[in-house]
Amino acid sequence: MKKILVIGATGKQGYAVVQALLEREYSVRAFTRNKENERLKALDSERLEIFEGDLNSEDDLRDAMSDVDGVYSVQPINRDDVQVELQQGRNIMKSAKAQGIEHIVYSTAGGVNRDRTGPHFEILAQLENELTDSDLHYTLVKPSFFMDNFLRIVQKDENHLYIPEFITPDIPFAMISTRDIAQIALHVFEHPQQYDGQSLEIASDELTLNQIVDTFETVTGVPTSIRGTFTSGTAERSWLEEKGYKVDFDLMTDINPDRLTLDRWIARQQW
């Protein structure tokens, strides 16, 4: 039975990976700053080990990587000091090399190393380059827009749903659920040689904002429209509109044939 270390195990993405691995009968070591994390403890699996550690500590990382077959890493964003992100990523790679890890699946973001600007994305690009230049067996997974973001940005007001305009409404963009990120990671761990050294920009659907509005209304039966704006910055919106995510959807179907398109994802939520 393979054992996988999941770094970032309490975040939405990492937690989904932990769940997917456990469902497929893997053993999982979940790396967290708090061993008493209620979400992890609620999984209540004899194949789950909760490991308390600090990404700033190479000793903690080496201990966490002992006797594991692979590593899934999704690092937390540090908005106060991106250099902390850089050093933590380097700690992960250095520890993986020291422990002879068979395969590391490293999650960054769609568009990294493809003109996506901003301190966080530039640090991720640097880490991608250092991983690519290392001797490690790795796969980069680069998620597109998170469908899960809609849980945060969609507003409900008197039986009406409102989605803010964060992109020109007739421009298509790719998106994915954390559930599907986990399924793709699982597939990579099951076929490590096939994806060794590859960079995968991943998604499960591609729609315009106008189509998203129509999809929400059709699935929920609740009138839906665009209201207000939401953006993490002018540069980020410009990148999404002018460059955007680049996803091979034929490959996505091969890797994840049961992928959640937006309508299927919406149907799983409470609105």
Q: Where are the predicted features?
A:
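Short, solvent-exposed polar/charged micro-motifs at secondary-structure junctions
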Residues: 61-62, 150-151, 233-239
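Rossmann-fold cofactor-recognition segment
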Residues: 44-56
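A hydrophobic C-terminal alpha-helical subdomain
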Residues: 219-271
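Short low-complexity, flexible loop/linker segments enriched in glycine and/or proline
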Residues: 44-47, 120-121, 155-156, 240-242
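Short secondary-structure boundary segments
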Residues: 75, 108, 228
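General small-molecule cofactor/ligand-binding pocket signal
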Residues: 49-51, 139, 225-229
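Oxidoreductase cofactor-interface core, primarily capturing Rossmann-like NAD(P)-dependent enzymes
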Residues: 2-40, 56-59, 66, 76-86, ...
